[in-house]
Amino acid sequence: MLSDIDICRTTPLKPIEQIAAKAGLLADEFETHGLYKAKVSARCVKRLAEQQDGKLVLVTAITPTPLGEGKTVTTIGLAQGLQSLNQSVMACIRQPSMGPVFGVKGGAAGGGYSQVAPMDELNLHLTGDIHAVTAAHNLAAAAIDARIYHEQRAGYQAFEARTGLPALRIDPDRVVWKRVMDHNDRALRKVRVGINDEGKTINGFEREEGFDISAASELMAILALSKNLQDMRERIGKVVLAYNLDSEPVSAEQLQVAGAMTVTLKEAIKPTLMQTLEGVPTLIHAGPFANIAHGNSSIIADEIALKLSSYVVTEAGFGSDMGLEKACNIKSSTSHKAPDCVVIVATLRGLKANSGLYDLKPGMPLPDALFQPDRAALESGFSNLKWHIDNAQKYGLPVVVAINQFPQDSAEELGQLKLWIQQLPLNVRVAISEGFAKGGKGMEAVAREVIEACDAPANFRPLYRAEQTLEEKIITVCTKGYGCGEVQFSDTAKQQLALYQTLGFGELAVCMAKTPLSISSDSSLKGAPSGFTIMVREVRLCAGAGFVYALTGNVMTMPGLPDIPAFMALDIDENGDIVGLS
């Protein structure tokens, strides 16, 4: 079989104007960026305001191996499968970060015959939205250090007299806004800025600083959760950048940088239109990770697609404990649109990995034994799939299991897994997913199950209520959402939660940052663990995004590169074509 990039390169694509017309966009509702990309204006939502929304299908997964289980393949393949059944459909996915592209997982365009195309343009820069987020974020970081420098250099009263601005009196030790970049770079997790030659202060005042990856920026979450440009402007103004010497929050509005940050993101708020290999219109917008952010594409993209098509297929990052939880408790509470159906992607290799019998290391190839028949390992790991089915049903949503088939998979084991699912007393639909090898035709069975599931009654319910305290919400997600026995809070986390409650942020949602490789916060606990303890070590405030961000275990907001990173395989040939991208 051809490589992903060769399949993409040898498949004829339609001009983006044809894809826009197919989606139902008018000529003044999109702007082309080259032959195969366009920026889409949300004005079409106003034009179609009276039109009934389509059905929203959310694709999630079992607890994945480090390489993933084919969620994007399933998302794109399912959209093509629905089209193959003559349904009006669009897909909505996140923009890939270059961190994973050059790091462990590689690209995020899907794979095989279920891809968004051109996949190299999607995976590398696209229309520059992530760079815009990075620039807007770092503008605020520069503004903070500049304000500290000018106020402290002159003295607060002299600064006020000279500028006519109020002194913000920022505490240099309580700046909470780190810088960001769209790469994995562990060396930048902790740095010092403002370093000067002896006796000089020209470079600012020295303080400890650090970098996060751009996907973890609060601005990325704001981009994904904003309903329009004005909403984004208001949210950016609420971002807390630091605290002053009286322990009061200093916002982007107070620093008078919120307007410029919004200007930098003016074009980024427009989703990018592309196409699948079979011509399904696909909106790409925002790129928050699900382990260190809220892990879902944008509300704006969903709203546009739901007005233009009968079915919208989107995905939530990692397993249902991660992206699905955040889709239901953060995204849906903001958009007031719940999924009509949940698709859980399961694989033989992923379930065997959840038996705990294999030693999997991020950045290393999966062991060959995972691809060999092993009924005992499959049966042991099946508990993980049952957990994820139960988890989706906690939210009152119909469930379809898509068994993503790999070429090495045993037909006997595929049949056995399907039988086990059919025997569950949980009213779950199931089908084999062959989108990678066969495109839309290989997804028709899953698509039929999804159509039926979307017509089934749903009774959506989030896990917690806004009026609960932040601590109560975190405990609810950990106990009801993950099944842990005890939640512990570090002294730092306790102090932070008390501060946020006092400052009036108690009604915000909670966004858990934890490993995606276990339902727990310990990546070594496989299957369906219960009774474990989760330690919340730090809680960060994202007032503009509308949540607090609880860090557990050893999760990092700036990833590092593995010993054999994906960038080693990338190059460019004499024709200017990229090679080695997957």
UniProtKB/Swiss-Prot annotation:
It is an enzyme of class 6 (ligase). Transmembrane segments: none annotated. Keywords: ATP-binding, Ligase, Nucleotide-binding, One-carbon metabolism. One of its GO terms (biological process) is tetrahydrofolate interconversion. It comes from the Bacteria. ATP binds at T65, P66, L67, G68, E69, G70, K71, T72. Its EC number is 6.3.4.3. GO terms for molecular function: ATP binding; formate-tetrahydrofolate ligase activity. It catalyses: (6S)-5,6,7,8-tetrahydrofolate + formate + ATP = (6R)-10-formyltetrahydrofolate + ADP + phosphate. Belongs to the formate--tetrahydrofolate ligase family. NCBIfam families: PRK13505.1, PRK13506.1. This is Formate--tetrahydrofolate ligase. The gene is fhs.
